[in-house]
Design a protein with these regions (language model features):
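Secondary-structure end/capping motifs
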Residues: 231-308
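Conserved C-terminal helix/tail region of periplasmic/extracytoplasmic solute-binding proteins
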Residues: 302-331
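Short, glycine-/small- and polar/acidic-enriched structural segments
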Residues: 6-11, 25, 29-164, 169-172, ...
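Extracytoplasmic/secreted envelope proteins and their assembly/folding machinery
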Residues: 49-52, 80, 95, 120, ...
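Ligand-binding clefts/hinges and TM-proximal coupling segments of bilobed small-molecule sensing domains
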Residues: 22-25, 146-167, 242-275, 313-316
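Pocket-lining segment of extracytoplasmic ligand-binding domains
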Residues: 170-171, 176-264
Length: 331
């Protein structure tokens, strides 16, 4: 009897030890998963940021072992400022923001462009102002956002129209002031990006003229970070780009579902998303066209007196290893 009890007691102890060990292992596994470093990304609240919203919604970041938090910001400038102050690890920003920030400091790295548009900016006037051609802006007031894609686009339209020396008054406004200023006829035209074009068309009683030139300016939205983060990030940026590429593939296959998702995330009507959707080209890239665009805008900024330094070497701003690694792993 004692032998039988000892055997069963020993068996029970083995089972207990195995059970406790399994429980401890499971708890350790959960704890380890919880300790995966959080990756914070400042994302501009615009349809241009669609790959990030899709990757988040579809769980694509998690598929690549990333614990990503998207922090919304009102513009590429504010996203970049969050990144430069170390409040986020990555940010989305236009090439204009990258260009201006690179004049100010040398700790910005560009990993890839994820969307382009040659029709996102527009030069708008209202029919009652009797301005239907760029030349009719002579002596008029044009609302622009100083030192931004808005101002660069307006100057590019003047040059493209062979009217570089046109006498026109630039009225510098904040983004939120542009549409109200045009609707109140405080300015005769505005150089604005979407969704401001949609808002003018929606809110204006009068018909709207687009005086701009499609294709004169190529907008890109880009993923940027800091050397101090990337130095210790390992393959995190590569996995981040892989998730974004999967999101872009999904966007191309499901445009209507993407617009519905964006409408919900941005809390805007689907019609607003659809307004400029066909102008967006979603793709990951990091090449000479973006480099040339940065160099062109840098020369414009110097000639316009917006910066006083000589232009930075934008080749040093490109951080191409994660992008090249992502391509290699997909081939």
């Amino acid at each position: 009897m004692q032998v039988w009890l000892k055997k069963h007691w020993a068996s029970g102890m083995v089972i207990l030890v195995l059970t406790v060990s399994a429980l401890l292992f499971y708890q350790h596994k959960i704890r380890t998963e919880d300790l995966v470093d959080e990756t914070k990304i400042g994302v501009s609240l615009t349809p241009l940021s669609a790959p990030f919203f899709v990757a988040d919604q579809m769980g694509l970041f998690k598929q690549y072992g990333l614990n990503v938090s998207l922090l919304p910001c009102s513009s590429g400038v504010s996203c970049a400022d969050l990144m430069l102050s170390s409040d986020v690890d990555y940010a989305t920003a236009s090439e204009s923001v990258v260009m201006f920030k690179s004049f100010q400091r040398d700790d910005i790295l560009l990993l890839a462009s994820f969307v382009e548009s040659d029709n996102d900016l527009k030069l708008l006037s209202l029919v009652p102002s009797k301005i239907s051609r760029v030349a009719q802006l002579e002596g008029k007031r044009v609302g622009v956002i100083k030192g931004s894609a808005s101002e660069f686009y307006f100057d590019s339209v003047l040059i493209g129209s062979n009217l570089r020396d046109l006498r026109v008054e630039k009225v510098y406004l904040q983004p939120k002031e542009l549409v109200p200023a045009l609707l109140a006829y405080n300015v005769d035209a505005i150089s604005a990006w979407e969704p401001m074009g949609f808002q003018v068309d929606l809110l204006s009683v009068a018909r709207v003229h687009n005086l701009g030139i499609e294709g004169v300016y190529q907008l890109s939205f880009n993923l940027i970070s800091r050397p101090s983060h990337l130095e210790f990030a390992g393959d995190e940026p590569t996995r981040l780009l892989q998730a974004l590429q999967d999101a872009i593939d999904w966007i191309k296959a499901h445009p209507d579902q993407t617009m519905t998702l964006l409408s919900q995330r941005l809390e805007v009507p689907v019609e607003q998303i659809d307004w400029s959707w066909d102008d967006y080209v979603f793709r990951l890239s990091l090449g000479n066209s973006l480099l040339s665009n940065l160099q062109l805008q840098a020369r414009w900024a110097i000639d316009s007196g917006l910066v006083s330094k000589s232009p930075p070497d934008f080749r040093r701003v490109f951080y191409s290893h994660p992008y090249q690694q992502m391509l290699a792993e997909r081939n």
